[in-house]
UniProtKB/Swiss-Prot annotation:
UniProt xrefs under Pfam families: Ribosomal_L3 (PF00297)
InterPro entries: Ribosomal_uL3, Ribosomal_uL3_bac/org-type, Ribosomal_uL3_CS, Transl_B-barrel_sf
Gene Ontology MF terms: rRNA binding; structural constituent of ribosome
Gene name of the encoded protein: rplC
UniProt keyword Coiled coil present: no
Keywords: Methylation, Ribonucleoprotein, Ribosomal protein, RNA-binding, rRNA-binding
Function comment: One of the primary rRNA binding proteins, it binds directly near the 3'-end of the 23S rRNA, where it nucleates assembly of the 50S subunit.
Organism: Thioalkalivibrio sulfidiphilus (strain HL-EbGR7)
GO CC annotations, alphabetized: cytosolic large ribosomal subunit
Chain positions found as N5-methylglutamine: Q153
Protein name per its UniProtKB record: Large ribosomal subunit protein uL3
Amino acid sequence: MAIGLVGRKLGMTRVFTEDGASLPVTVIEVDPNRVTQVKTEERDGYRALQVTTGARKASRVTKPRAGHFAKAGVEAGRGLWEFRLDGDQGAEIETGAELKVDIFEAGQIVDVTGISKGKGFQGVIKRHNFSMQDATHGNSLSHRAPGSIGQNQTPGRVFKGKKMAGHMGNERCTVQNLEVVRVDVERNLLLIKGAVPGSTGGNVLVRPGVKAKG
């Protein structure tokens, strides 16, 4: 894993390249991430950076977490996130340090993780991209039905993992290999090409792409 940043999705817009092409981009506000704990192999069993960002009223912070923030000497944030470290990565970073948007650069390939928009209970066509059955030719009840979901008395059950109707969305998911189009250090903004998971105002994790070439 690599050191990333926690940001907030502001929405989508577009930017124009020098040759006039229009690029759809997602705008992510990345306030400085404050390091609340540096986890070590000896004490915690693995190496990681724990960070927080944003602000939260003291009345909305639990006592254990308030003590954790106070021990780190940082302002209480809206949550805690971790970035696992490999080898000697992040050895120079100490508790209380700030990670800012300038750790990324234009043209870099990143992975973005967020909580997808909840869609409620959906059928197999929307949820699993099934094809519809015939609209006519004798079909009057099964236009959007999944079809067969099993066999006969043997095995006499529906196998686990069978794609069926159910709750869709509101899950943690990652979109990989997105390009950073622009880094606005003054306004703490990242402009990333394409769409990222989540609704406007949702928390997203931006990390260097694990499958990036080069």
